[in-house]
Amino acid sequence: MAPPNTIDAGLTQRHISTSAAPTSAKPAFERNYQLPEFTIKEIRECIPAHCFERSGLRGLCHVAIDLTWASLLFLAATQIDKFENPLIRYLAWPAYWIMQGIVCTGIWVLAHECGHQSFSTSKTLNNTVGWILHSMLLVPYHSWRISHSKHHKATGHMTKDQVFVPKTRSQVGLPPKENAAAAVQEEDMSVHLDEEAPIVTLFWMVIQFLFGWPAYLIMNASGQDYGRWTSHFHTYSPIFEPRNFFDIIISDLGVLAALGALIYASMQLSLLTVTKYYIVPYLFVNFWLVLITFLQHTDPKLPHYREGAWNFQRGALCTVDRSFGKFLDHMFHGIVHTHVAHHLFSQMPFYHAEEATYHLKKLLGEYYVYDPSPIVVAVWRSFRECRFVEDHGDVVFFKK
């Protein structure tokens, strides 16, 4: 069995020399990249049939477990302020925030399963459970389900993907590559970015990881450019079609109900209480969601495609599996270390994705991408080096 691809210390995307390879200073992986030629039929046939079987009972058991953990953590947090020792309180609250953020991220993932209809064979059960769970986390369920479906149908496509769409050379203010002055300006820009104070990079990372998720929902931050204001809460957003109107209304009502409950709790208890029990863990959920999805789709060695080269399976392979450690991988229901399988077959339930990944590795060989880098290293590398792609070309890679 071919070993999985690795990033940085060894990620290679089928390093095969061709006579057409340019002699520029492009990295070797970009010069020698060849398009994968797998069909979706042969990919599906390598996975055992039972991996596609869905169980509503099993899905509900996972929901019950996660909600039980969230409830127990909430009840434990009600005892924190009873400790007279301030040191215990100062340590216990962050512990609660971190753990509740992890658990609620797992709940978010289960709602995400519902949106893909991989939770059960019942569309009614899927949408009911998904709407409840996502509304609790201030996510417009159907709105995001629709845009996320479009993301899966066009992953890695420069003009059709819905999120983490790279900026182009012209969008970051660089002159055309053919311009003689472009090389000098690009080099100056690269030097500037390399010398950028780490604290500045860290600041923008914090902003993106804490507020990037609501910014995407509210104003389509990092999403596809539609040429006008776009929001998941707007019934006439260009993301949606007229037939989605009532789904958007239902989604908005779910979020409004959750916000109403939070406002009522703030009035009855206090804003500080709601902040400690809900808002801070909610920010941790935002952090995990953006971190996970950013790392899944952003790396210097992953290509993006334009219409001339894109197809579904090529786009689905433009994502990275990695591990956050056994505990987090378990709590996040495999969304991190089985993401390639998920993108190929989004209706496959998460509890079969690990077995499916085992078989996919054998078929895909070096086209299966796994990154063993420490998470901090991977984030820093992608954040600093993935700045833009070229304005032209069917296959483009990130530049810095």
UniProtKB/Swiss-Prot annotation:
Entry's EC annotation: 1.14.19.6
Variant or mutagenesis effect after changing H116Y: In SR88; exhibits a complete delta(12) desaturation deficiency with accumulation of Mead acid
InterPro entries (UniProt xref): FA_desaturase_dom, Fatty_acid_desaturase
Main subcellular location of this protein, as a coarse class: membrane
Catalysed reaction, written as an equation: (9Z)-octadecenoyl-CoA + 2 Fe(II)-[cytochrome b5] + O2 + 2 H(+) = (9Z,12Z)-octadecadienoyl-CoA + 2 Fe(III)-[cytochrome b5] + 2 H2O; (9Z)-hexadecenoyl-CoA + 2 Fe(II)-[cytochrome b5] + O2 + 2 H(+) = (9Z,12Z)-hexadecadienoyl-CoA + 2 Fe(III)-[cytochrome b5] + 2 H2O
Motif (Histidine box-1): 112-116
Motif Histidine box-3: chain residues: 339-343
Bilayer topology annotation: Multi-pass membrane protein
Highest taxon of source: Eukaryota
Any one Gene Ontology molecular-function term assigned to this protein's record: acyl-CoA (9+3)-desaturase activity
Parts of the chain that traverse the membrane: 91-111, 199-219, 245-265, 277-297
UniProt cross-references to Pfam families, sorted A to Z: FA_desaturase (PF00487)
Keywords: Fatty acid biosynthesis, Fatty acid metabolism, Lipid biosynthesis, Lipid metabolism, Membrane, Oxidoreductase, Repeat, Transmembrane, Transmembrane helix
Coiled coil: none
Pathway the protein acts in: Lipid metabolism; polyunsaturated fatty acid biosynthesis
GO cellular component: membrane
Position of sequence motif Histidine box-2: 148-152
Transmembrane in keyword set: yes
PANTHER family for the chain: OMEGA-6 FATTY ACID DESATURASE, CHLOROPLASTIC
Family note: Belongs to the fatty acid desaturase type 1 family.
Comment field on protein domains: The histidine box domains may contain the active site and/or be involved in metal ion binding.
Record's protein name: Delta(12) fatty acid desaturase
